């Protein structure tokens, strides 16, 4: 593969790529656990549960297992508790990672179309991007409940390509996890990964991606706008 890659549009993951949301997600999870009379969990543990949407995060927090399935009645009680808690903690300790704003500015200046593609529900995605003053950078936002399927399924990426009227090979996804790598490969798109995100506790260097980039800004140096 030769760099810089010719690209028309860039899609960027949210949690663990644009924003370090783990502190606020963890606070909400522990508020939920406390209300349910359960022991609170360390930040590092909850951080490893992030990546497949809020329902999965709640299930993992309740069971202590990445693939755990709690009692259906418990889950039914827990979900609204978590959602109410996260509404309160949404943008308390969440911050953009170094190089994010510089990268977004460089991409905009370079003429790239931009999409945020996340597994987070729209009810939290849009307020969070707005609070972080990032929403206006994006032409489109595809949330975890925007479509019938979410990452690692390629549907959100293919949907964004259709909206941009481009082919998947003209698109780059920047993410932090196996979800992102698998979705991009299934869509036929390029993918860069950042090493500072969550990836459900796994080593990002084991992922099938085209490059590991230390920041979104550094990613901009490996692509060029194609006509």
UniProtKB/Swiss-Prot annotation:
This protein's UniProt keywords: Carbohydrate metabolism, Hydrolase, Magnesium, Metal-binding
Residues annotated as the enzyme's active site: 13
UniProt keyword annotation of Hydrolase present: yes
Pathway(s) the chain acts in: Organic acid metabolism; glycolate biosynthesis; glycolate from 2-phosphoglycolate: step 1/1
GO BP: carbohydrate metabolic process; DNA repair; glycolate biosynthetic process
Catalytic activity of the protein: 2-phosphoglycolate + H2O = glycolate + phosphate
InterPro entries per UniProt: HAD-like_hydrolase_sf, HAD-like_sf, HAD-SF_hydro_IA, HAD_2, HAD_sf, PGP-like_dom2, PGPase_prok
S-S bridge residues: none
A single Gene Ontology CC term: cytosol
UniProt signal peptide: none
Assigned EC number: 3.1.3.18
Cofactor: Mg(2+)
Annotated positions binding Mg(2+): 13, 15, 176
Magnesium in keyword set: yes
Pfam families given in the database record: HAD_2
Function: Specifically catalyzes the dephosphorylation of 2-phosphoglycolate. Is involved in the dissimilation of the intracellular 2-phosphoglycolate formed during the DNA repair of 3'-phosphoglycolate ends, a major class of DNA lesions induced by oxidative stress.
Name the record gives this protein: Phosphoglycolate phosphatase
């Amino acid at each position: 593969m030769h760099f810089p890659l010719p690209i028309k549009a860039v899609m960027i993951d949210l949690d663990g790529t644009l924003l370090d949301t783990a502190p606020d997600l963890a606070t909400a999870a522990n508020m939920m656990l406390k209300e349910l009379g359960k022991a609170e969990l360390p930040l590092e543990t909850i951080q490893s549960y992030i990546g497949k949407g809020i329902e999965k995060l709640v299930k993992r927090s309740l069971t202590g297992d990445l693939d755990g399935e709690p009692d259906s009645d418990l889950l039914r009680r827990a979900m609204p508790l978590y959602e109410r808690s996260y509404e309160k903690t949404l943008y308390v300790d969440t911050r953009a990672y170094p190089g994010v704003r510089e990268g977004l500015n460089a991409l905009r200046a370079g003429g790239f179309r931009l999409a945020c593609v996340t597994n987070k529900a729209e009810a939290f995605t849009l307020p969070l991007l707005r609070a972080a003053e990032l929403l206006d950078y994006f032409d489109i936002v595809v949330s975890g409940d925007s479509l019938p399927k979410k990452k690692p399924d390629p549907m959100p990426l293919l949907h964004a390509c259709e909206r941009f009227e481009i082919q998947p090979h003209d698109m780059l996804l920047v993410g932090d996890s196996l979800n992102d790598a698998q979705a991009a490969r299934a869509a036929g798109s390029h993918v860069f990964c950042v090493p500072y995100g969550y990836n459900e506790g796994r080593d990002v260097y084991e992922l099938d991606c085209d490059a590991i980039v230390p920041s979104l800004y550094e990613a901009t140096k490996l692509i060029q706008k194609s006509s």
